[in-house]
Amino acid sequence: MTAPVKLAIVFYSSTGTGYAMAQEAAEAGRAAGAEVRLLKVRETAPQDVIDGQDAWKANIEAMKDVPEATPADLEWAEAIVFSSPTRFGGATSQMRAFIDTLGGLWSSGKLANKTFSAMTSAQNVNGGQETTLQTLYMTAMHWGAVLTPPGYTDEVIFKSGGNPYGASVTANGQPLLENDRASIRHQVRRQVELTAKLLG
């Protein structure tokens, strides 16, 4: 019997959209037969800033039982999904801070040949969603990872906004739309399937 693909979903979320996307990705991974670790990156924002936003405080409480990602989690993984909201056209400082802890794994080649895809969200359609995904993929390219963006491999990509780089959601404080959820499911299922093929 073939061992399940080891999938790490590493996310940052301030007000809940990213957490919802990561949960959807985790469910899709399990449905595809993967062993899944759902992991948040460490919060680095000052507490007084967080306390000034009710949605942020509520989301931190909702995520309290989600373990924090470590380099060891990425060493374990065979497939990696990063999810970060857009901040000024790139990933959040919290996600970048986590990425900056991975130098040891990178220098020893332990991130090479893992599959990688990415997801993001922003408050508006032109809020830097594509550039955020591209910068995350650029990081994975430095690792020697195998990029597995969804492209236009399913009709749902067009229905959810047409982003070939990865699932991207225009956040408005509401639950994820079904097309967004379906796009995430397709992306993760495809990545798990491709990873299994690469592992032989």
Curated annotation (Swiss-Prot):
GO cellular component, one term: membrane
Cofactor: FMN
GO MF term set: FMN binding; NAD(P)H dehydrogenase (quinone) activity; NADH:ubiquinone reductase (non-electrogenic) activity; NADPH dehydrogenase (quinone) activity
InterPro entries, A to Z: Flavodoxin/NO_synth, Flavoprotein-like_sf, Flavoprotein_WrbA-like
Note describing how the cofactor binds: Binds 1 FMN per monomer.
Entries under PROSITE patterns matching the protein: FLAVODOXIN_LIKE
Subunit note: Homotetramer.
Protein's UniProt name: NAD(P)H dehydrogenase (quinone)
Lineage of source species: Bacteria, Thermotogati, Deinococcota, Deinococci, Deinococcales
